[in-house]
A protein has these predicted regions:
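Short, charged, surface-exposed secondary-structure boundary motifs
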Residues: 23-28, 48, 69-75, 87-94, ...
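Active-site PLP attachment segment
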Residues: 75-118
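PLP-dependent aminotransferase class I/II
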Residues: 18-19, 38, 101-270
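PLP-dependent aminotransferase-like
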Residues: 1-68
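Short, glycine/charged-enriched secondary-structure capping and boundary segments
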Residues: 6-9, 51-54, 74-77, 93-94, ...
Length: 270
């Protein structure tokens, strides 16, 4: 819905396409010069598909909101989100060849920092309602430049160590859980830096049990469930894929505890 919002606001016509079990597009329509093809670099794991599509679709737009560390391709319009990867109240990046002569105002994040502070001093659970309210406030916003606060935070981060930690944590989960996962996205032979570890399972109730175990697992694409047939692959993925955390806040000990919890639950659930 975040993508659809500006399209509806600007009265831009759009249509959906299907994806397969590799999260690649199922699409063979010719793209006209007045049209564009938008593809999401899912979880930061689909850079090879992005590169492939860039060779065939001159009007490709890449959604790298889930792939902060993926390099943009020359001549391909690409956008990124800092909020999905780091503890900032706002912030995004746009790579484009278009010339923008508009001086956008700087965003004031004062109303959207409470949940970030609460997560540090207390817990994510205790401030989830604040997070939801912050998300609502971000909807239907006019375009702004990144806030000074987010800019300062992002300028102070050790990105090399963040990349290493995310990849290390992903490898831990991949090694332990691949046998139980309908997805198999290895990062051993590429430079992908994942957002999460996508655990696609048929075990009913695993998400709810993890939440009870105080493991925060956001559900992606809840809007998809209400829009497509339950027999579609996309419906199954949206319903049954669990986004396991791998980010830079978690050390090896924490990841091993997570693996143990999932393994135990996986053995007891039908």
């Amino acid at each position: 819905d975040v993508i659809i919002e500006p399209l509806m606001k600007l009265n831009v016509k759009y249509e959906y396409y299907h994806i397969n079990s590799l999260l690649d597009p199922v699409f063979d329509k010719k793209i006209e010069s007045s049209e564009a093809f938008l593809y999401t670099n899912y979880f930061g794991l689909k850079q090879d598909t992005v590169l492939y599509l860039s060779r065939f679709y001159p009007n490709l737009i890449v959604d790298n909101a889930q792939a902060f560390f993926a390099k943009p391709i020359e001549g391909v319009d690409t956008f990124y989100s800092a909020r999905k990867f780091f503890g900032v109240p706002d912030g995004a990046y746009l790579y484009t060849t278009a010339l923008l002569d508009i001086d956008f105002p700087i965003y004031n994040p004062i109303d959207n920092i409470n949940y970030l502070i609460g997560r540090i001093t207390d817990s994510a659970e205790g401030y989830y309602k604040d997070f939801q309210e912050s998300e609502k406030r971000m909807s239907n916003q006019e375009i702004h430049r990144m806030s000074v606060l987010s800019d300062k935070i992002l300028s102070s981060l050790d990105y090399v160590s963040i990349i290493e930690r995310r990849r290390f944590n992903y490898h831990l989960l991949y090694s332990a859980l691949t046998a139980f996962n309908k997805f198999d996205f290895s990062i051993s032979e590429n430079q992908n830096v994942p957002l999460i570890y996508p655990f696609y399972t048929s075990k009913a109730g695993l998400r709810q049990q993890l939440i009870l175990e105080h493991v925060y697992v956001p559900q992606y694409w809840q809007n998809v469930v209400n829009k497509i047939d339950a027999k579609c692959l996309e419906y199954s993925i949206a319903n049954n894929m669990i986004a396991l955390p791998i980010d830079q806040r978690y050390d090896e000990k924490t990841m091993n505890i997570l693996i143990e919890k999932i393994s135990n639950l996986n053995n007891h659930l039908s």
